[in-house]
Amino acid sequence: MMLHIPGVLTNAQVAQCRELLDAADWVDGNATSGAQSALAKRNRQLPEGSPVARAVGDAIQDALARHALFFSAALPLKVFPPLFNRYAGGETFGTHVDNAIRLLRGTDFRVRSDLSATLFLAEPDAYDGGELCVEDTYGVHRAKLPAGDLVLYPASSLHHVTPVTRGERVASFFWIQSMVRDDGDRTLLFQLDTQIQALSAEKGAKDPMVISLTGIYHNLLRKWADA
């Protein structure tokens, strides 16, 4: 499931993040690449351990923790600290698949990459190109979202970023280990939760059907979750 999650950051928060990011020192994006990605990746990136990356990453994680739609869709168990990249002057990232396990350098913190996320930090009209293209059995899905919005998709997906031919594309990217590892199971839970919320808004939280469906949701989560 590929999902657009709007409003993770406000316009003011995006501006604060960009002020810090634009003043930071960036390095070749292959600093974090696997063997396959290094052949396809042409961009710049903040070093993982930089104070700016940590500060902006913490702000993003705080925002994610408050975002109900993100939690419902991802059911996060662990979130890899957000990383940051930028593309300009024809820079691109060819077709690749993300590594299954991400290790935070200098620590024993590991994340199984069930989900990949890109949080856009530049407005779509600020650059040409730079679309995130995610492939699945139904074709290629493209994302170029407003600043502050996030796209979430299975980390097992082949994906690429088209060349940026004007302006600059700035984004954060990171991976999530979900409590529910299977994408199909996780999608069913998200769909069920969405319907429960809609029914609750219509009939009230004390409605017998809402209570029954909520019980089914939690029993399925209990069956499938690792916590």
UniProtKB/Swiss-Prot annotation:
Q: How is the cofactor bound?
A: Binds 1 Fe(2+) ion per subunit.
Q: Which cofactor does it need?
A: Fe(2+); L-ascorbate
Keywords per UniProt: Dioxygenase, Iron, Metal-binding, Oxidoreductase, Vitamin C
The record's InterPro entries line, in alphabetical order, gives:
Oxoglu/Fe-dep_dioxygenase_dom (IPR005123), PKHD_C (IPR041097), PKHD_hydroxylase (IPR023550), Pro_4_hyd_alph (IPR006620), Pro_4_hyd_alph_FE2OG_OXY (IPR044862)
Residues given in the record as 2-oxoglutarate binding sites: R169
Provide the top EC class. oxidoreductase
Where Fe cation binds, per the record, is at H96, D98, H159
- For this protein, the Enzyme Commission number is 1.14.11.-
Tell me the domain of life.
Bacteria
Q: Name one GO biological process term.
A: intracellular iron ion homeostasis
Looking up SMART domains in the UniProt record yields: P4Hc
Q: Which residues form the Fe2OG dioxygenase domain?
A: 78-178
Cite the GO molecular-function annotations of the record: 2-oxoglutarate-dependent dioxygenase activity; iron ion binding; L-ascorbic acid binding
Any Pfam family matching the protein: PKHD_C
The name of this protein is: PKHD-type hydroxylase BamMC406_4714
Highest lineage ranks of the organism?
A: Bacteria, Pseudomonadati, Pseudomonadota, Betaproteobacteria, Burkholderiales
